[in-house]
Amino acid sequence: MAEIIVMNRRDDPQRRGLSPGDVPAEFEVDPEKRLVLVRFTSEVTVEKIAEYAAHLRMHPAFRPTFGEIVDLRKTREIKLQADDFLRLADQIDPFSPEAKRAFVVRTNIQNQAARMHRILRPKRNIEIFNSFEQAESWVRK
């Protein structure tokens, strides 16, 4: 059974500088499907991705070999620099190199960010899609 974790919703959003509807990410871990689904909203920064990765590592059902679908379609802005991409790939990423990863994008900027992550990972098992259904089908193969 999948468990949905909404980051920061338990905290007072205004105390963290967020409006109540501006939660940076929510994720669910489905151990039966061996899959993690993360939805980023508002803006994506290296700090928000690191926070997601830390929460995910602490989840008792998470395994680094699970597949992942990263849904970027609701993000308004991606604030990542070249050194952020390197840090994400080398230090923050909680998944093993063998894990299948799918990015679901809506804009060219989201597509470029996903492509950068794919380039920096040692194995080329990251794909980019425009629909959630295509991404899920590919990850589950």
Regions found by a protein language model. Give the residues of each.
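Amphipathic, Lys/Arg-enriched alpha-helical "gate/interface" segment within cytosolic domains
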Residues: A2-K141
